[in-house]
Swiss-Prot record:
Protein's recorded name: Flagellar assembly factor FliW
Keywords: Bacterial flagellum biogenesis, Chaperone, Cytoplasm, Translation regulation
Quaternary structure annotation from Swiss-Prot or TrEMBL: Monomer. One copy interacts with the each alpha-helical wing of the CsrA homodimer, yielding a FliW-CsrA(2)-FliW complex. Comparison with a CsrA-mRNA structure (2JPP) suggests CsrA cannot bind both mRNA and FliW at the same time. Interacts with flagellin.
Transmembrane residue ranges: none
GO biological process, one term: bacterial-type flagellum assembly
Keyword Cytoplasm: yes
Amino acid sequence: MKIATKYHGDIEIHEKDIVRFEQGIPGFLEEKQFVLLPLEDTPFIILQSVNTPALGFVLIEPFSYFPTYEIDLDDNTLEQLQITGEQDVALYVILTVADPFDDTTANLQAPIVINVHKRLGKQVILTNTNYKTKHRLFPEKVAK
């Protein structure tokens, strides 16, 4: 099927590549179907709405930038996403891309969790955590 995207123009996708967010994403509850589209020659991935071309979130796998990042998924999330083990899970965080790019932040408090085998996803809001919605990707470049 052909879809229009925010960053990649019109592209062809396969039904099997669609990730279903049964509850939508907070702030976008009606959006339930997304695809993951790598941005060529970057570590970034676009979580692109299948139905709304202008809706694409910039993601990263957090461990390259935040090597000690760790979360515990509650039983409800494990059940919703039909997760049986770590091999089922892909974990991403949403970026707020800034200008200059050195000011870009990652939302570590609300990761995107995807069951890669069942193609089910959810944005998980972490509670009782020290993670915030804005962690700088490049903390060493903070202005003095």
